[in-house]
Amino acid sequence: MANKIKKGDTVVVLSGKDKGKTGEVTQALPKDGKVVVAGVNVITRHRKPTQQNPQGGLERKEAPLFASKVALADPKTGKPTRVRFETRDGKKVRVAVKSGETING
């Protein structure tokens, strides 16, 4: 199945501790069915001191979310929408179901 959410898309989180937050997809992991969204699902990792990082300490980073837990933000309204594929001018494009707007990318 084709990827409906791609890197650079603006998405809305549908469930979980970050429900309702919006952010840009920084990484798409289609084999795992997950996406990484900027500023969402931030976790803290305790890092030991190493030669590259002699200080060590706490590292905050975004963890992947299941793609089913996010929805693309409609380009017109900013609300969550589903995505469908259509052929326009001989090219396969992604279209927001709610508004019918073509999605970039």
UniProtKB/Swiss-Prot annotation:
Which N-terminal residues, if any, form the signal peptide?
Answer: none
Listed Pfam families: KOW, ribosomal_L24
Q: Can you name this protein?
A: Large ribosomal subunit protein uL24
Species name for this entry? Answer: Sphingopyxis alaskensis (strain DSM 13593 / LMG 18877 / RB2256)
Question: What job does this protein perform?
Answer: One of two assembly initiator proteins, it binds directly to the 5'-end of the 23S rRNA, where it nucleates assembly of the 50S subunit. One of the proteins that surrounds the polypeptide exit tunnel on the outside of the subunit.
Q: Which InterPro entries match?
A: KOW (IPR005824), Rib_uL2_dom2 (IPR014722), Ribosomal_uL24 (IPR003256), Ribosomal_uL24_CS (IPR005825), Ribosomal_uL24_KOW (IPR041988), Translation_prot_SH3-like_sf (IPR008991)
Asked if the record carries the keyword RNA-binding, the reply is yes
Q: Name one GO biological process term.
A: translation
Q: Does the keyword Transmembrane helix apply?
A: no
Q: Name one GO cellular component term.
A: ribosome
PANTHER family hit by this protein = MITOCHONDRIAL RIBOSOMAL PROTEIN L24
